Amino acid sequence: MPDFGANDLDAFWMPFTPNRRFKRHPRMLSSASGMWYRTPESREVLDATSGLWCVNAGHDRPKIREAIQKQAAEMDYAPCFNMGHPLAFQFASRLAQITPKGLDRIFFTNSGSESVDTALKIALAYHRARGKGTKTRLIGRERGYHGVGFGGISVGGIPKNRMYFGSLLTGVDHLPHTHGLPGNTCAKGQPENGAHLADDLERIVALHDASNIAAVIVEPVAGSTGVLIPPKGYLERLRAICDKHDILLIFDEVITGFGRVGAPFAAERFGVTPDLICMAKGLTNAAVPCGAVAASGKIYDAMMDGADAPIELFHGYTYSAHPLACAAGLATLETYREDDLFARAAGLEGYWQDAMHSLADARHVVDVRNLGLVAGIELEPRPGAPTARAMEVFETCFDEGLLIRVTGDIIALSPPLILEKDHIDRMVETIRRVLGQVD
């Protein structure tokens, strides 16, 4: 292994990482191709997490790599304030062809966190443009993850994401989560119980009045909190209540977008169309940072018609629609289409589901959840040391040649959509073996 001295490791303050623990036992990746990472020691590691839920088409896709190289040689950067470049408009048009019907106005960001904060700001500005400026309250959900911007952590519901950063945004409420309901343990696909929890939105409306509520934001499938699948009928109820009270519904599809659940977006999988969709990750196969918000025509038209200044939305980023990101995104969408990866994910769901639920009797496992090509395997916490068991499983799996993701005491799996059945078998065999080794 290369010599990573103390100074080499000290400079980088790593995100979402126990830095002190990492430096005692660093894990390094040096290259990637297809389903595999390679370490500096030339050891192969099977990617069961698509990097961080984002390399949906697999690593080192030639079409994407070559598009980035070509664009970098032609034009490395172009601003999109008061001017544009052709790829930005091409990318937006192509993306609008696969978003749910009616969500065809695209605002580019650089990450999922930025997409969430952008969607929240659009929701507030939309109501103001319609002369309903009192509609400012935002509704999130317990255990929700919406990135790390101040808007996202305010509507998010993971305590560790919130507790260190003060009072956050005011005027935010949270719906109850749907985790751990009786009768839902080891449900395959959508669980039967829990749709009634959406009705808590009516309680919040009664408390604050609909005239003060702007939007509800949820992940259709809550990923970072441990793969929580929405109960049957839950999202439909949220949509109906939002419609009843003129409240916008925002889907955070940063994880679920681009084939993860066997459809372009979870909105289509569940048959529920929101007013705004947040996306990132699989948008460019993670080759270049990029995010986007897809907005409905009614929102865009209201902003254009109700603007009280030449600039209809005072919002944007230096790197919005970055030329390299647009090149990567266009090539990524073409790769999804050429390889029919969304349908491929749907076709593998049955095998994936059976394989994941075969772990229900493995040591320490208390629940298994799945949808599309995503799964959560929940472990019994180690007494007096929550999260310690899952972290040890993560580290041991890596040493055994498998990259997984853990959140709390839950193993989260989200492999590239190019995986084969033998990859699934290997994941299950490794996880079962490691669970048998870890106390």
UniProtKB/Swiss-Prot annotation:
Pyridoxal 5'-phosphate binds at G112, S113, T318. It holds the Pfam family Aminotran_3. Its cofactor is pyridoxal 5'-phosphate. Optimum pH is 8.5. It is an enzyme of class 2 (transferase). It catalyses: 3-oxopropanoate + L-alanine = beta-alanine + pyruvate; 3-aminobutanoate + pyruvate = acetoacetate + L-alanine; benzylamine + pyruvate = benzaldehyde + L-alanine; (S)-1-phenylethylamine + pyruvate = acetophenone + L-alanine. It comes from the Bacteria. One of its GO terms (biological process) is biotin biosynthetic process. InterPro entries: Aminotrans_3, Aminotrans_3_PPA_site, PyrdxlP-dep_Trfase, PyrdxlP-dep_Trfase_major, PyrdxlP-dep_Trfase_small. Homotetramer. Belongs to the class-III pyridoxal-phosphate-dependent aminotransferase family. This is Omega-aminotransferase.
